[in-house]
Amino acid sequence: ATKRDFETKNRKKFCGRIATGDYDAVIIGHSQFEKIPMSIERQRAILEQQLEELTDGIMDLKRNRGENFSIKQLEKSKKSVKQKLEKLNDQSRKDDVVTFEELGVDRLFIDESHYYKNLYLYTKMRNVGGIAQTEAQKSSDLFMKCRYLDELTGGRGTVFATGTPISNSMVELYTIQRYLQYNTLVKNNLQHFDSWASTFGETVTAVELTPEGTGY
């Protein structure tokens, strides 16, 4: 696929060719891949699930008299998810393109998969290095597509390729598992980062040099 294929005037035609053609593989760039959306119904279902998880987390903190800071962080995340849902419900896409589900894709091979490490993360932890408070839209988009392919293939629909699966933090290992082994995490009640971290990790206090090497 070329950039021209994904210009607004050509995108629907190109996606239609994928959906109706008999191809062994279709190779496209990361930025173009993001332009093929999941259906609004599936996006809504996943956002509603995230909202439910956040609500449960907030209630759990209040029940156990958790720190106000942690509660506020989760409430901030909840507000952000609500805004996404409202935007989705009000959405009437002018660029009416074929959705990802309609393409007939049954496998994803993601090269340079480390570019998708900024996936949303909800946690009650504070002052722990490597826990990002931001998310990239392309990561959320890929996560939805991985979940969809898991349903089609029984958890064998996505392959990652990268030379740096973990570059800065063990949180990245958890993120990879969410992409590739989400159902396994759910089966073992490890889909929430705090449960995963308490099972496989240990929080320690230590002096650490900054990436620039100019301080601690």
Give the ranges of each region predicted by the language model.
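Conserved nucleotide-binding/hydrolysis micro-motifs of P-loop NTPases
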Residues: D5-E7, S31-E34, H114-Y116, T164-N168
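Conserved helicase/translocase P-loop NTPase motor core
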Residues: A25-E34, I71-D106, L119, N127-G130, ...
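Conserved motor-coupling elements within RecA-like helicase/translocase cores
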Residues: T8-V26
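Short aromatic-enriched loop/helix-cap "lid" or pocket-rim segments at secondary-structure transitions
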Residues: R11-F14, M38-E41, Y120-T123, E172
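Conserved P-loop NTPase motor "coupling/switch" region that bridges the ATPase
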Residues: K3-R4, E48-I71, R107, K124-Y216
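Short basic/glycine-enriched coil/helix segment immediately N-terminal to the Walker B
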Residues: C15-G21, L47, K94-D106, Y148-G155
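Conserved helicase motor
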Residues: A1-K12, G29-K35, A136
